[in-house]
Design a protein with these regions (language model features):
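Interfacial segments of multi-pass membrane proteins
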Residues: 1-3, 77-99
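Membrane-interfacial helical/loop segments at transmembrane boundaries in membrane proteins
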Residues: 79-87, 162-178
Length: 178
């Protein structure tokens, strides 16, 4: 870690956010597997029209994990980036490499999820799988997806008012800095 207050807070916030957006993505993948009978992307396609709520949840989760504003992944990654910059102000130029590596990781994550979104939801169906009676998540599967996607948005739009204030600051406040 960066050892700075903002870096530690950013790391804790990112752990919380990771649990939220990764859970969203896993739930959406589960719905796709349950409804389509496969998670092989080359056998899917065109599911956005058949599963709009699942597509929306996957889209929010993918953008959040990639650090796109105004979602929660951006807010915590921004704090981590600030921690890198603050910790590097007295250490020469090594911080630039760490910052570039972190940003490159986010860009590569976005690229991978663009492929997932396109192959699963947006491209023309490659097999007869989408001609089956595929439907979106039911209420029991859909409510958690919608709730977690909403948390991704709320934690991104109001990062300091909600998660940082109530979860992160109390934890960071207990750490003694030298």
């Amino acid at each position: 870690g960066t050892g700075t207050a903002v870096g530690i807070a950013g790391g804790l916030f990112h752990m919380l956010n990771h649990a939220v957006y990764k859970s969203t993505l896993f739930l959406c993948a589960g719905v796709v597997e349950k409804r389509a009978g496969t998670t092989e992307m080359d056998r899917l396609g065109g599911l956005a029209k058949l599963m709009p709520w699942t597509f929306a949840g996957t889209l929010v989760g993918a953008l959040a994990i990639s650090g796109i504003p105004p979602l929660n992944g951006f807010a915590s990654k921004w704090m981590v980036y600030q921690g890198i910059i603050v910790s590097g102000k007295d250490d020469g130029t090594l911080w630039v490499i760490w910052l570039a590596a972190a940003m490159l990781g986010s860009a590569l994550t976005l690229a991978s999820f663009v492929k997932v979104l396109h192959a699963t939801y947006l491209c023309k169906p490659t097999t007869a799988i989408t001609r089956r009676n595929i439907r979106d998540a039911g209420v029991a599967m859909g409510i958690p997806i919608v709730f977690l996607a909403a948390v991704c948005i709320v934690f991104g739009v109001f990062p300091t008012a909600l998660p940082v204030r109530f979860f992160i600051e109390p934890a960071v406040g207990t750490i003694a800095f030298s």
